[in-house]
Design a protein with these regions (language model features):
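Beta->alpha turn/N-cap motifs
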Residues: 25-29, 39-52, 66, 100, ...
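A ligand-binding cleft/hinge motif common to bilobed small-molecule-binding domains
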Residues: 45-57, 108, 132-159, 167
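Short helix-initiation/N-cap motifs at beta->coil->alpha
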Residues: 23-34, 119-131, 167-169
């Protein structure tokens, strides 16, 4: 499945760069993080925290990104009187994806003391996390604001928001220092053409993404800080 998403992009980039580009699949976060932080990858597509980290540590340059921003909210049930602010979640259960999921990282960024953090009840899927929180399996959850708007659309709100993280740029493709600077613009332009849109269509549809737009280093500056407590990124 992943090869189907990436192979058309690999073929296009091989043509643009003039060298064979190969797709390297990693089946888990640990091996991906280890290889990525060691600088094994020259072209990477992933989230803003990783892009920010690579800009700072590996001299990567983001070239195109998905257009919509990420906004995450930490929510609890509207009638939960024991939790009034996000800090009250220290030591309590939170239904969330396993870190380094971006939503989970934004929530954890509000807890500086490693000994005073929420307990993550690993839950896959935003809707599942939301439902588990309403069912009382955890005190709170973190979801994209669009997901909250969809699920809590009634006049009588079922939830209250404890924290809203600042908007962040979406997933991006970055290129590393082994790719000549004069090729960066060429690659970006190729990905934005009609041929590029065709090549990236399967990948973008997997993320409900519209057409790529140009990306800049400034947009992702400082985003790597979200990974400060994650293995391999310290």
């Amino acid at each position: 499945e992943f090869v189907l998403h990436y192979q058309p992009i690999v073929d296009l980039l091989s043509k643009v760069i003039g060298k064979k580009v190969t797709y390297q699949y990693s089946d888990n976060w640990l091996s991906y993080s280890k290889d990525m932080t060691e600088g094994s990858y020259d072209i990477v597509f992933d989230g803003p925290a990783f892009n920010g980290w690579r800009i700072e540590k590996l001299s990567h340059t983001p070239i195109v990104r998905l257009p919509e921003d990420f906004v995450f909210v930490v929510i609890t049930k509207a009638d939960n009187d024991r939790v009034k602010q996000v800090k009250d979640l220290a030591g309590r259960k939170i239904c969330a994806h396993a870190p380094p999921n971006l939503g989970t990282l934004t929530m954890l960024s509000q807890f500086d003391n490693p000994a005073r953090q929420p307990v993550i009840i690993e839950t896959k899927g935003w809707d599942n996390s939301y439902k588990a929180m309403l069912d009382g399996k955890c005190a709170a959850t973190v979801v994209p604001i669009k997901n909250l708007t969809k699920n809590d659309a009634g006049t009588k709100k079922l939830t209250k928001t404890l924290y809203q993280h600042k908007a962040m740029p979406n997933q991006a493709i970055s290129v590393g220092p082994r790719i000549a600077p004069e090729l960066h613009k060429k690659i970006a332009q190729a990905l934005l053409t009609e041929e590029g849109k065709q090549a990236t269509s399967k990948l973008r549809s997997a993320y409900a993404g519209k057409d790529f737009v140009p990306a800049t280093r400034d947009e992702y500056a400082g985003m790597g800080d979200l990974l400060k407590s994650s293995l391999y990124y310290r």
